[in-house]
Swiss-Prot record, chains A, B:
Residues of the Radical SAM core domain: 48-278
PROSITE patterns in the cross-refs: RADICAL_SAM
Protein family: Belongs to the radical SAM superfamily. Biotin synthase family.
Protein name: Biotin synthase
Co-factor binding comment: Binds 1 [4Fe-4S] cluster. The cluster is coordinated with 3 cysteines and an exchangeable S-adenosyl-L-methionine.
Organism, as annotated: Geotalea daltonii (strain DSM 22248 / JCM 15807 / FRC-32) (Geobacter daltonii)
Length: 329, 329
């Protein structure tokens, strides 16, 4: 069944959906046969989310000592890695990093903490205070990624001015046991629902190259669609020494782009941002991510790995004739 | 007149031509509207010349002291630049560089000499001897670029085993007087004809970003089509201190890609290789050149500027799932 991507693109643009079997078939495309898939993804993106690029940055506000055993993670206490270990940074530092992110042109700034959840009381309060100051003193939109949360914490974050809560599913339901055995997938799914119920937008995606199959990547995309998340961060594994996946084979650039395009077709109206592992996995093909359907990218450093200088990303966007979305678009 | 690029691509694939006015209209496309143009160029390229990439390298065998006043050229005696000045390198060196180029994966190796023409007698003989040795001792195909030549020189090169003669028109007939006033455009056109008549294939293209208009770029493409050259090297100006164009504004990456695509549509069956100025002008978009219709690229250093390491180009080709054409394909 040779897919007519023009027609499929039009169907999705007119509000129709892509079927799982169609996505699985598109997953078999290779080499230049992928170009029409990218073309369709690009048209769908522009139709639903426009052609501006959304930039975001993060701060690793609390690092290491995580009791979870996620196979890829340098911050897991189950791994011996060089990832820094420190407790929650102070409010001043959170606000200073927000200013730095704004200076770099990011519209969204994520405060990320390692660990299954943050401790109620002092830790949550310090973050909420920082969010309030960031709201008052900068033009950047603060978001938080504090692990598994309940309604009380979610409401506190809303009250402090958090707009978006980030919590990844990391992979598909069927592959998750291969990634993490210290908590259940449904706890992550539930965190997404709790955050939405409290009135937060949800930024939820995952990481590819963990050993999952293409079908499992597609499975994850459909789960995100069911949960109706608001933005989807896509990471590509940057194997870190000391983790279970230190010797994992890198996902190829064209496979990264194919994954982005499939997510765009399955999640046509969502913000899809390319985050961790972009430079490492895409190399010379980084400039293809927007053609493949992404509408945003993280700039600056990642959680435990460094990103390239923001100026290089800005030059790439200029070279692509792409402009940057300002904050709340 | 909104061009249907699908239909235009099919017309060209079926042997039809693109009209000048159609090319001029495509020259107005900007941003993501260029993606379908690249898609059409890519399909046309694959139809006529396949999806393998042709790699070539050159040696600057005689440098500087050129009496011509080409505005872009660091080797012109009319300019004060840092370009090295040396007479014709010896046969041993020419052969050694051929081996280096072969090691880098190039299928074609160009022996280039500055100056209006090379001197008959000793200079020509030394080059012909080197060509004979390169033929015997390596698997790479030697080509020559020795300026304006007559039938006698062309025949000597054929006899020595040269397959392709390189001689650029540099720009369009109408813009040429702005580039060079020390010789006439028709001398270059005639050199192409002389070489073809002697049984040589001809590699003939030019350089963009000299101040020419888009229409003049298109004009040059149609002149090359009339001359029925065999391969078309496209260079993008890398402004060199001391030349008339030292402060020229760089042509943008998308303009470079648009030019490549237009040349593919106008010269559908030809080998189109991206040469000088690729890294400088295309930056993160170097990986788009083949999608835009190019079927080859120069690797290693250029005449008077350095190229990036061959390994980086090989990684880019691998990442694009593109394989390299072996020598005489």
């Amino acid at each position: 069944m040779k897919m007519n991507l023009e027609k499929l693109g039009e169907r999705i643009i007119e509000g129709g959906d892509i079927l799982v079997e169609e996505a699985l078939e598109l997953a078999n495309l290779r080499g230049s046969a992928l170009y029409p898939l990218f073309g369709a993804a690009s048209r769908i993106k522009e139709h639903f989310v426009g052609d501006k690029v959304f930039l975001c940055s993060i701060v690793n506000a609390k690092s290491g000592r995580c009791p979870e055993n996620c196979s890829f993670c340098a911050q897991s206490a189950h791994h011996k890695t060089d990832a820094p270990v420190y407790s929650l940074i102070d409010e001043e530092r959170m606000v200073a990093c927000a200013r730095e992110a704004e200076k770099n042109g990011s519209s969204c700034y994520g405060i990320i903490t390692s660990g299954t959840s943050i401790k109620k009381g002092e830790e949550l309060e310090r973050i909420c205070n920082a969010v309030r100051r960031i709201r008052r003193e900068t033009g950047i939109t603060p978001s938080c990624s504090l692990g598994i949360i309940n309604h009380e914490t979610a409401s506190a974050l809303v009250e402090a001015g958090v707009e978006t809560y980030h919590h990844n599913l990391e992979t598909s339901r069927s592959f998750f046991p291969n990634v993490c055995t210290t908590h259940d997938y449904e706890e992550d799914v539930n965190t997404v629902r709790v955050a939405k119920k409290a009135g937060l937008k949800v930024c939820c995606g995952g990481i590819f190259g963990l050993g999952e199959s293409v079908a499992q990547r597609i499975e994850m995309a459909y789960t995100l669609r069911e949960l109706d998340v608001d933005s989807v961060p896509l990471n590509f594994l940057n194997p870190i020494a000391g983790t279970k996946l230190e010797n994992a084979e890198n996902i190829t650039p064209m496979e990264c782009l194919q994954t982005i395009a499939l997510f765009r077709l399955i999640l046509p109206t969502k913000r899809i941002s390319i985050c961790g592992g972009r430079e490492k996995n895409l190399r010379d093909l980084q400039s293809w991510i927007f053609f493949a359907g992404a509408s945003g990218t993280m700039i600056g450093n990642y959680l435990t790995t460094t990103g390239r200088a923001a100026e290089e990303d800005w030059q790439m966007l200029k070279d692509l004739n792409l402009s940057v979305a300002s904050c709340c678009e």
